[in-house]
Amino acid sequence: MRVVIQRVKGAILSVRKENIGENEKELEIISEIKNGLICFLGIHKNDTWEDALYIIRKCLNLRLWNNDNKTWDKNVKDLNYELLIVSQFTLFGNTKKGNKPDFHLAKEPNEALIFYNKIIDEFKKQYNDDKIKIGKFGNYMNIDVTNDGPVTIYIDTHDINLNK
């Protein structure tokens, strides 16, 4: 599992409105956060629940904010901030051959949706239902992000030994 975590002052996620023509570009906002983290989540075809729990723990507990006296001392929960979790299979785009990305390492969409929903439920269970916002799985999304720092962290559970 891969996650790109960005510390943000705000993020707005929009999708194309339902019931409009294919050529229309009108968007509607479905998720918005103020201070917090945007987490772009890629699910590998071989990911397990242990991978998910590791990513959830890191997203909720990484100390990415300063305290009055210490740097890198507070996490999203300490500050009662929000998270926007966005499924992004393109994190497993392989570009080793040619110029067209190959996404065969990403989990199959139907299976990924079930796993993603379980991950979101666990985020809400471990933190606060009202503080977890999501994108729309499998849809085109427009995301406006105001980075804070910038602070960007990349985690790949396949780089870590999770008792595999």
Swiss-Prot record:
Changing residue 137 to A: Loss of deacylation of D-tyrosyl-tRNA(Tyr), loss of deacylation of glycyl-tRNA(Gly). Changing residue 112 to F: Loss of deacylation of D-tyrosyl-tRNA(Tyr), loss of deacylation of glycyl-tRNA(Gly), not toxic upon overexpression. SUPFAM superfamilies: DTD-like. A motif (C-terminal adenosine nucleotide of tRNA) lies at residues 104-107. TRNA binds at residues 72, 89. It comes from the Eukaryota. A motif (Gly-cisPro motif, allows the protein to recognize chirality of D-amino acids) lies at residues 149-150. Keywords: Cytoplasm, Hydrolase, Nucleotide-binding, RNA-binding, tRNA-binding. It catalyses: glycyl-tRNA(Ala) + H2O = tRNA(Ala) + glycine + H(+); a D-aminoacyl-tRNA + H2O = a tRNA + a D-alpha-amino acid + H(+); D-tyrosyl-tRNA(Tyr) + H2O = D-tyrosine + tRNA(Tyr). It holds the Pfam family Tyr_Deacylase. The active site is at residue 90. Homodimer. A Gly-cisPro motif from one monomer fits into the active site of the other monomer to allow specific chiral rejection of L-amino acids. This is D-aminoacyl-tRNA deacylase.
